[in-house]
A protein has these predicted regions:
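Extracytoplasmic gate region of multi-pass secondary transporters
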Residues: 48, 227-268, 275
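Helix-breaking motifs and short loop linkers at transmembrane-helix boundaries and internal kinks
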Residues: 59, 91, 112-117, 311-312
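Helix-to-loop junctions at the C-terminal end of transmembrane segments
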Residues: 79-91, 277-289, 375
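Conserved MFS/SLC helix-loop-helix module at the cytosolic interface between two early adjacent transmembrane helices
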Residues: 79-114
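Paired small-residue
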Residues: 106, 117-125, 315-323
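Cytoplasmic helix-loop-helix junction between adjacent transmembrane helices
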Residues: 122-161
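C-terminal membrane-cytosol helix-exit motif in multi-pass small-molecule transporters
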Residues: 175, 194-214, 397-401
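A late C-terminal transmembrane helix in Major Facilitator Superfamily
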Residues: 342-377
Length: 411
């Protein structure tokens, strides 16, 4: 697949003397992160908060409930596949805006219907919008980060900190809305989150687009992806493993007797831990240009997913949320850094697209497969065990990915 380069302007923010030059790339990527905040942090992950109420009110099985995340992941994969071409046509920032608007509109649709097919289509659209926003935004963020080579990994990770922040926001709202309005109020949660998203999107929409933001008529280099095949498999396993945990963990907490406060605290812990990752992992990401940073982060991720199997106390659940959260959003940063370190800039779109496809297939298969296992076994504990096993296997694979040689990069 030959993908176009998604170019980023040197500055998205106004060149005001009040904004120091060293700060502009960080602020730019934080503003770009509003796309993933709405499309992923709220649009995808908040579903876990309303899943128990939707499942009870709409009389769904776990397989049916998990299908909503499966179709969302399929939409994400589709959005990721069209993101580069869309950005080539309309510009990278315009693609991020359009994808975020599509995700926001689909949140409103979720508040308007209880029909399974209509909800599935809305979840599909959320995924498409999120995929466009994340991939187009990720390419822009990677280019923005080049303005500060010494802090490039940190500046890039600010963009990928968007989903954890969205998790915190939804965690502070959804459980208490459900508690206030009672069973069957899942649609009110979607309405409130859609209204919140309409406020959050404003800075992204008013960000100026200078003439330098135009996408050049340049095509990406054809680079063999075979040398990074292990990385692709590892990312597939990560996609399948992490989404299973995030899909069912709130239902697990509720089944243990956790009320709104417990559910909110658990979810916010995941998000807060995830938001801290740019500072926690910056040295790890810079240590090695092969797969070892990804392997280390995935191992921590797997430990977090496995902890609930060792005990059900509030302290153990809180530890699980913190450990899982501090690792899960950094895997994408690590794989993007692997591409940036090992391939020429003109090959980034093709490599990132391949990683996105691998990840997308994994997270499409993960929820439905784990949901079917849960229905068959009758316990969410099996879902968490499968999640941890997939993440640990992904870590083992990543550890075998070596730094690409010059001949690999040029092949």
């Amino acid at each position: 697949m030959n993908c176009p380069i998604i170019a980023a302007p040197e500055h998205f923010l106004p060149t005001s003397q009040s904004v120091p030059t060293a700060v502009r790339p960080a602020l730019t990527n934080l503003t770009l992160s509003l796309g993933p905040i709405i499309g992923l942090g709220i649009g995808r992950f908040a579903y876990a908060l309303v899943l128990p109420d939707m499942r009870d009110s709409l009389h769904w099985s776990y397989s049916a409930a998990s299908f909503m995340n499966t179709v969302n992941a399929a939409g994400y994969l589709l959005g990721a596949l069209i993101a580069a071409q869309l950005a080539q046509r309309v510009g990278g920032l315009a693609a991020v805006r359009g994808g975020t608007l599509a995700a926001l509109a689909s949140l409103a649709v979720c508040a308007m219907t209880s029909d399974f097919a209509a909800l599935s289509l809305a979840r599909l659209m959320t995924g498409i919008g999120a995929g466009v926003a994340l991939v187009a935004g990720g390419a822009l963020a990677a280019r923005v980060a080049l303005a500060q080579p010494a802090r490039a990994s940190f500046v890039l990770s600010l963009f990928y900190a968007g989903p954890p922040l969205g998790i915190v926001v939804s965690g502070l709202i959804a459980p208490f809305v459900l508690q206030a309005f009672g069973p069957g109020s899942w649609w009110i949660v979607w309405a409130v989150l859609a209204a919140l998203g309409a406020v959050l999107i404003v800075p992204l929409l008013v960000m100026p687009i200078p003439a330098s933001a135009a996408v050049p008529e340049t095509r990406a280099d054809r680079v063999s992806l075979r040398p990074m095949a292990i990385c692709l498999v590892s990312y597939f396993l990560y996609g399948a493993g992490y989404i299973a945990y995030l899909t069912f963990m709130i239902a697990y907490v509720r089944d243990l007797g956790g009320g709104a406060v417990a559910q909110s605290a658990f979810w916010c812990l995941i998000g807060l831990a995830g938001f801290s990752t740019p500072w926690v992992w910056r040295r790890v990401l810079a240590l090695d240009r092969g797969g070892r940073p990804t392997a280390f982060i995935l191992t921590v991720n797997a430990i977090g997913a496995a902890l609930p199997s060792l005990g059900h106390s509030p302290a153990m659940l809180a530890l699980s949320a913190a450990v899982f959260g501090i690792a899960f959003s950094t895997v994408t940063t690590a794989t993007t850094a692997f591409v940036r370190f090992n391939l020429p800039q003109s090959a980034w779109p093709r490599a990132i697209a391949a990683l996105t496809i691998s990840f997308g297939i994994g997270q499409t298969m993960g929820p439905f497969g784990v949901g079917a296992i849960t229905d068959a076994m009758g316990s969410l504990t099996y879902a968490l065990n499968v999640s941890a096993a997939l993440l640990l296997l992904g870590a083992a694979m990543a550890a075998m990915q070596s730094k690409l040689k010059r001949t690999d990069r040029a092949s």
